[in-house]
Regions:
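Catalytic Walker B motif of ABC-type/P-loop ATPase nucleotide-binding domains
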Residues: 81-85
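Conserved catalytic motifs of ABC-family nucleotide-binding domains
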Residues: 77
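Conserved ABC ATPase signature
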Residues: 56-60
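ABC-type ATPase nucleotide-binding domains, specifically the catalytic core motifs of the NBD
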Residues: 16-37, 45-47, 142, 158-160
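ABC ATPase C-loop
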Residues: 73-74
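Hydrophobic anchor residue at the start of the ABC signature
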Residues: 70
Length: 160
């Protein structure tokens, strides 16, 4: 059990390879062999990373970098992921990819994901439970799908 934090800002090491970046996720673990095995499992799962494992991270697209950041956190085998603004700065196709990855981690790997997201629509579509904040205070709370259809939320955040 553990918690991993995925930063909002680009946090890959650009001159290190994709594989080296992944292994940094397990740097603080005592069991380095376990980190190597988990990194290999992740590389097998994500073809985009596997195909670029020996390339420097600076050649990755924004979406691929975000995938690498998420994957690096997974090397620690956390049960909880704190994810800060996963869609920020990404093209729409990569936003979809990132949320598909997060949904897979939630549903298939049983990860608990606590998400902060400026794209209210994507965040609420993803959320089991959502909190809408106004000036740092909880304005509305509820199930994600209910908030998505709440006209007050729509007026405030979704342009509805």
């Amino acid at each position: 059990m553990g918690i991993a934090y995925i930063l909002q800002d680009n946090s890959v090491f650009p001159d290190m390879t994709v594989e080296e970046n992944l292994l940094m996720g397990g740097f603080i673990k005592d069991k380095t062999e376990e980190s190597f095995q988990e990194a290999e499992r992740i590389l097998q799962k994500y073809e985009r990373l596997r195909n670029r494992r020996n390339q420097p991270a600076k050649v990755l697209s924004g979406g691929e970098r975000r995938l690498l950041e998420i994957s690096r956190a997974l090397v620690m085998k956390p049960s909880v992921l704190l994810v800060d603004e996963p869609s920020i700065g990404l093209e729409p196709r990569y936003i979809e990819m990132v949320f598909e990855i997060l949904r897979d981690l939630q549903q298939n790997e049983k990860k608990t994901i606590i998400l902060v997201e400026q794209n209210a629509k994507k965040g609420l579509e993803f959320a089991d439970i959502g909190y809408v904040l106004v000036s740092g205070q909880t304005a509305i709370a509820g199930k994600g799908d209910e908030l998505l259809n709440n006209p007050d939320v729509g007026r405030l955040f979704l342009g509805g």
